[in-house]
Amino acid sequence: MLKKRSRSKQALMAETNQSQNQKQSKTTPFPRLFTAFSSFKSFTENDAVASPTSILDTKPFSVLKNPFGSDNPKTQEPETRLKLEPKRIGLAIVDSLIQDETPEPGPRSGTILFGSQLRIRVPDSPISSSDFGIKTRNSQPETKKPGSESGLGSPRIISGYFPASDMELSEDYTCVTCHGPNPRTIHIFDNCIVESQPGVVFFRSSDPVNESDSDYSPPDSFLSCCCNCKKSLGPRDDIFMYRGDRAFCSSECRSIEMMMSEENDTK
């Protein structure tokens, strides 16, 4: 009896083991096929990432995507609009520049006035100096007509009166100041020498002056004697000049005169 029971238990255990093995085989069919497929898939992914097959391939990670999913790209309308906007702005700027560079209808004519072509309108000689300032306050320069004079470099004579304040503001005005015991100031306006008086100037030509104009040219006898010791100077004597209008017999006399003139200038 005991032997029969043990045999029946062994038979039941064997049947249960067979049924469990059959269930496991049904749940995991072809295990080797799946392991091979997974290893092949990982190898292809690594190979595709490391070395792309084409230069034009813009999707290096396309292998990692779901092969069964839909690869339809999304709509890119806002991106295309953003890309087109800079081009439109650039074309608008170019159009505006072209419109600015277009010449305006009608010729443009301009006149250029040089300093030597200006002339001052000088009124008639006034009766008093007070009337002169009132009349010449609103005077305006006139333009010279092209053919009114023979040439630009020719000396000209201006007759009349002119305020010194207006003359000093002109570009054609030059002032020469001479220092010494007899200081004087020479005003030159354009091509003319000016004779000055308080507040009013008189014009005269810059031609060589006559002997009677002793104020602006040294006398003919200034080389006949020394300005310091009054020694007479002959044609064969050495003459030492100072400031162009003073002659001396020696360098000592000239140095004395120079020291005296410097002392007078400092006072």
UniProtKB/Swiss-Prot annotation:
The keyword Zinc applies. Induction: Down-regulated in response to mild as well as prolonged energy depletion. Up-regulated by glucose and sucrose. Residues 1-29, 124-156 are annotated as: Disordered. InterPro entries: FLZ8/MARD1 (IPR044593), Zf-FLZ_dom (IPR007650). One of its GO terms (molecular function) is zinc ion binding. Pfam families: zf-FLZ. Residues 15-28, 126-141 have a biased composition (Polar residues). Belongs to the FLZ family. Interacts with KIN10 and KIN11 via its FLZ-type zinc finger domain. Interacts with KINB1, KINB2, KINB3 and SNF4 via its N-terminal part. Interacts with HB21/ZHD3. PANTHER family: FCS-LIKE ZINC FINGER 8. This is FCS-Like Zinc finger 8. It comes from Arabidopsis thaliana (Mouse-ear cress).
